[in-house]
Amino acid sequence: MDFINSYEDANRAAAYSTLQFANTYFLAYRDLPAIIAHHVAGKRALDFGCGTGRSTRFLQALGFDVIGVDISEDMVRLARDTDPSGDYRLIPGDDFTGLGVGNFDLVLSAFTFDNVPGGLKGRIISDLGKLLTPKGAIISIVSSPEIYTHEWASFSTKDFPENASAKSGDVVRIIVTDHHDRRPVEDILCTDDTYQEIFANAGLNAIQTLRPLATRSESYTWSNETTVAPWVIYVLKRAS
């Protein structure tokens, strides 16, 4: 199956701009303030793959001076419309020229690598590592392989039984149910073993790996989130 970047689409961007920090998405962000406070000292941040600016505004609320970057013109336009005072930049592919080597205390990547195919992941992660200050950190939130084989408060995969036999690098499909655009999103499955190999080749260490689970005390109607982690959060630092 050929891969299509589902988010280079004006209608998809408009739907994506309505997403909040609710349901399954809540678990991706719930623990970030504590994770960031533990691993990040400075306040200069890059939101890589900022989309319509949801994660960028999240970092702003934590006191960061943030630049949001994305390859989608529609996404960046909507981010600027929502947050006119924010710094949102359209970048061509994986060209980080102008962002500054060693300039960022934090690089956040929320779900971006789900849509990055093949060997491009490794090159981008390596280049992002070069943007870090000596003690800086990359925090990368990615979909767990299990997200593509279960039902969730924010997603459905029941129409795609072929996901169950997918291997790392294969195209998988999922439907976001938290907005009105119910067209399937195509992602690239990537296992933990593959990510760990990519990190090592990029000269980065995964110093913490988290798989957040929901609790029954939270004010959402969970499907599988209390027993199966939909997300994996990697905290990466330069190898010494």
Task: Give the ranges of each region predicted by the language model.
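Conserved class I S-adenosyl-L-methionine
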Residues: 1-40, 54, 58
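Nucleotide donor/acceptor-binding cores
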Residues: 42-44
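Class I SAM-dependent methyltransferase SAM/SAH-binding core
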Residues: 46, 52-96
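A short acidic, Gly/Pro-enriched loop at the edge of an enzyme's catalytic core
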Residues: 98-107
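A short SAM/SAH-binding and catalytic strip from SAM-dependent methyltransferases
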Residues: 106-120
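A short glycine-rich, Lys/Arg-flanked "PGG" loop and its adjoining helix->strand segment in the class I
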Residues: 122-134
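SAM-dependent methyltransferase
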Residues: 138-197
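C-terminal lobe and adjacent flexible extensions of AdoMet/dcAdoMet transferase-like proteins
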Residues: 202-240
